[in-house]
């Protein structure tokens, strides 16, 4: 395997500016090519396994060197033309240059290797539930805003490895109904003269533009994130409501703090309604500016259907506990099948929305939602439940949650994860030798085509007291 071009490489070792010829042997977890030279790992964004390229080293990152391609010397049979013209610059979707079947194969192999390495788990996976659309799947976008030195508004995601905006007029992974609004909204905000600087210098003005759509209803909610009240937005908001019938509401979210957290605590209505309707698994939900809701609605419905189907095969004498329940996207479909469900969630606003959604769908009598620390609430609810569903944030289950589960293990446990590494870590503890559980099934779900992300559902069954 060629490693250098033999012209600049020497025994002095790697340094910024050094030119090499390398061949990628794998992709890292961010979807960038990985090569080796003189014992060093070299990251080559844009290079696929098996491809050779002339590269230039840029900077050292701990035990790795970041490089950029000067010239790609050959092409993998799995390479394709990216569907987005900004794919090489934008840091949002790092696998667009890889055919989608190859994306899925790589993701499933990543899942297998991660489970084996971090969890000691060598278990067959079911084929990933895939989104055949590939594009246009995102029901929400939060897009940074900034005025350039020429005073023109830039709107787009960050350039790879930086906080510089890649100016865009469309985004192919956005729902096409939202994508059609991106350019006219940018033009309106540009001509408004309002200052804009997402979070670089934290100057006053616009920070982000938020777009959200009900996949099944077509209703749209526009949100402008700003550091302060901007009276000029009131006029724009009314114009948007009148211009586009699907736009049911325009809100202003205030984020005055110096933080990377996009949304602030205060949201006000500029025009129309504060929420939009969505139909999810046949149930009606209300989505606001700050509601946490899965980005890919059809894929979320498929994974919830898997959970409902698996739990419905068992004779459950007690209730199902849904930990990290959010607004009830798993709890309510389970209740609709006749189960009694107890939802646990630390965010009181989400609990309020879950209760409202339950009442709106006639499921209030079969659901109970509690706000508070999940570990503490589990200690009070596990003794009487027959099954547990957990859908934690990316950091995975807190140690106290795992201890609560192992102290009083329910008969069935469904663990949905958005981070395979933390899930593998947690499963290692839940599946410890002489422990109460055995792993029954791994079901990966590709929520985010063109990216490295893969969600995974693990089904565990209790085998001992």
Swiss-Prot record:
Molecular function GO terms recorded: 4 iron, 4 sulfur cluster binding; metal ion binding; rRNA (uridine-C5-)-methyltransferase activity
Transmembrane segments: none
Residues holding [4Fe-4S] cluster: 84, 90, 93, 171
EC number: 2.1.1.-
Domain TRAM: 13-71
UniProt entry tagged with the keyword Oxidoreductase: no
Keyword terms, alphabetized: 4Fe-4S, Iron, Iron-sulfur, Metal-binding, Methyltransferase, S-adenosyl-L-methionine, Transferase
SUPFAM superfamilies, sorted: Nucleic acid-binding proteins, S-adenosyl-L-methionine-dependent methyltransferases
Similarity comment: family membership: Belongs to the class I-like SAM-binding methyltransferase superfamily. RNA M5U methyltransferase family.
Name of the molecule in the record: Uncharacterized RNA methyltransferase SYNW1228
Organism: Parasynechococcus marenigrum (strain WH8102)
């Amino acid at each position: 395997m060629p490693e250098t071009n033999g012209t600049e490489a020497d025994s002095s070792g790697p340094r910024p500016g050094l030119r090499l010829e390398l061949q990628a042997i794998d992709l890292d977890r961010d979807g960038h090519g990985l090569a080796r030279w003189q014992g060093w790992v070299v990251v080559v964004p844009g290079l696929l396994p098996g491809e050779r390229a002339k590269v230039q080293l840029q900077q050292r990152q701990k035990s790795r060197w970041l490089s950029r391609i000067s010239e790609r010397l050959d092409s993998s049979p799995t390479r394709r033309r990216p569907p987005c013209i900004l794919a090489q610059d934008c840091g949002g979707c790092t696998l667009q240059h890889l055919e989608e079947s190859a994306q899925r194969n790589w993701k499933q192999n990543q899942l297998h290797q991660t489970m084996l390495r971090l969890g000691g788990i060598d278990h067959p996976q079911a084929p990933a539930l895939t989104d055949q659309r590939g594009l246009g799947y995102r029901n929400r976008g939060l897009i940074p805003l900034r005025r350039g030195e020429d005073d023109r508004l830039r709107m787009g995601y960050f350039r790879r490895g930086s906080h510089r905006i890649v100016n865009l007029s469309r985004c192919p992974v956005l729902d096409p109904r939202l994508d059609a609004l991106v350019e006219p909204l940018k033009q309106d905000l540009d001509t408004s003269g309002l200052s804009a600087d997402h979070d670089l210098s934290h100057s006053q003005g616009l920070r982000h533009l938020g777009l959200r759509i009900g996949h099944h209803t077509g209703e749209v909610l526009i949100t402008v994130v700003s550091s302060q009240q901007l009276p000029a937005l009131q006029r724009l908001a009314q114009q948007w409501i009148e211009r586009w019938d699907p736009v049911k509401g325009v809100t202003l979210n205030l984020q005055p703090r110096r933080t990377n957290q996009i949304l602030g605590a205060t949201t006000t209505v500029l025009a129309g309604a504060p929420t939009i309707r969505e139909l999810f698994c046949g149930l009606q939900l209300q989505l606001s500016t700050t509601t946490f809701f899965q980005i890919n609605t059809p894929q979320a419905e498929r994974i919830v259907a898997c959970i409902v189907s698996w739990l419905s095969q068992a004779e459950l004498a007690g209730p199902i506990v849904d930990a990290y329940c959010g607004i009830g996207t798993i709890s309510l479909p389970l209740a609709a099948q006749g189960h009694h469900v107890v939802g646990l969630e630390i965010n009181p606003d989400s609990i309020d929305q879950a209760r409202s959604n339950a009442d709106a769908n006639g499921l209030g009598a079969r659901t109970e939602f509690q706000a508070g620390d999940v570990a503490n609430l589990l200690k009070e609810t596990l003794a009487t439940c027959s099954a547990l569903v957990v859908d934690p944030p990316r950091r995975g289950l807190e140690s106290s949650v795992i201890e609560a589960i192992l102290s009083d293990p329910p008969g069935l446990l469904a663990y949905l994860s958005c981070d395979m590494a933390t899930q593998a870590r947690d499963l290692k503890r839940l599946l410890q030798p002489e422990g109460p559980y055995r792993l029954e099934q791994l079901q990966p779900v590709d929520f985010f085509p063109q990216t490295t992300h893969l969600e995974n559902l693990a089904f565990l069954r209790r085998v001992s007291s």
